[in-house]
Design a protein with these regions (language model features):
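A broad, low-specificity signal marking well-ordered, structured residues that form hydrophobic/aromatic
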Residues: 47, 165, 179, 219, ...
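Short acidic, S/G/P-rich loop/turn micro-motifs used as interaction or catalytic elements
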Residues: 56, 186-190, 227-228, 277
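Alpha-helical oligomerization segments
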Residues: 194-197, 217-288
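Extended, low-hydrophobicity segments enriched in charged/polar residues
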Residues: 1-176
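Short beta-strand
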Residues: 210-215
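Surface-exposed, low-hydrophobicity interaction/linker segments
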Residues: 156-202
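Generic detection of long, well-ordered alpha-helical segments
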Residues: 22-26, 190-193, 230
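Short amphipathic beta-strand starts and helix->beta connectors
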Residues: 202-209
Length: 288
């Protein structure tokens, strides 16, 4: 893992903090918040990177494909140039169509049937469910990053194969640009970096949702203003389903459970079942 870490920070020479394996989950939550609030004054955006060979390989492949640079020749300058080009192209696209249209086009491209049959109807006609969710607003879920839960459970014998958590401060004010600097996805059914830029920008403007974690097979967002109506929870649940079709069945045991999990939730978790090199055994603990 030492070689992996050295390669990563050579590509990303930005201030960062390493979270030790087995650290209490509260430590990651606390330090992430501190980086987030400090970053607003410094013009930086923190992101928790769950570094493992698969994530780094995905990033390198995405950068290599767009820049026509062999993986072994990718440098920090290559990554920065890639990110700036992606962000510039995204800004031009948003100037033409707007943030909402760009996100909706990304949703539709990812899952056209869900977009046409469910999402558009929900946006136009109201709620899918008949009854309001009964959770009182004062019973909001506490903020807790799944990456911290996984890291807390890492045993000494598993350290060599476990992802290492880094809180990295990227030179960004536009938080959606995280997906340009760390181009997650583009394999199997996972969104491309370009799609995630559009979706993340939409979620930030509408929901004040910050990208919080990028791992090889999942991402997390943090929002200080969780959804508090059934309609908003259903809209968000359909959006999450379009981004990751495995979420309702493989993680939350049905769409209604996903709706309930997002209601009052400060942490959004999106997970993909397939990986380009291996299948992951790490999934979010299922709610009771």
């Amino acid at each position: 893992m030492a070689e992996l870490y050295e390669r990563f920070i050579a590509l990303y020479p930005y201030p960062h903090e390493r979270i030790r394996h087995g650290a209490p989950r509260a430590e990651l939550n606390r330090r992430y918040f501190e980086h987030l609030y400090e970053g607003k004054n410094r013009g930086t955006t923190p992101i928790v990177v769950a570094l493992d060979p698969t994530l780094l390989g995905t990033i390198e492949n995405n950068v290599s494909l767009r820049t026509s640079t062999p993986v072994q020749d990718i440098t920090a300058d290559t990554v920065e140039r890639y990110a700036h080009e992606l962000i510039t192209d995204q800004h031009h696209y948003l100037d033409q169509v707007g943030v909402e249209v760009a996100a909706h086009e990304a949703f539709r491209h990812l899952n056209e049937s869900a977009y046409l049959q469910t999402y558009r109807r929900l946006m136009e006609n109201g709620e899918l469910g008949e009854d309001d969710i009964g959770t009182p607003l004062k019973a909001e879920y506490p903020f807790e990053l799944t990456a911290g839960i996984i890291n807390e459970k890492v045993k000494a014998t598993d350290i060599d194969s476990a992802a290492e958590l880094l809180i990295m401060d990227l030179p960004l004010r536009d938080v959606s640009g995280v997906f340009a600097y760390l181009p997650f996805g583009g394999w199997d059914s996972s969104p491309s970096p370009e799609a995630m830029l559009s979706i993340a920008r939409y979620w930030f403007e509408r929901d004040d949702a910050y990208p919080a974690v990028i791992a090889s097979d999942f991402i997390e967002f943090y929002t200080p203003v969780p959804v508090t109506t059934r309609r908003d929870a259903e809209i968000l649940a359909v959006e999450h389903t379009m981004v990751s079709s495995a979420m309702p069945v493989r993680v939350y045991r049905g769409f209604d459970k996903l709706v309930e999990a997002l209601y009052g939730q400060h942490d959004w978790y999106l997970w993909w079942e397939q990986l380009p090199r291996r299948r992951s055994s790490l999934k979010r603990p299922k709610p009771a």
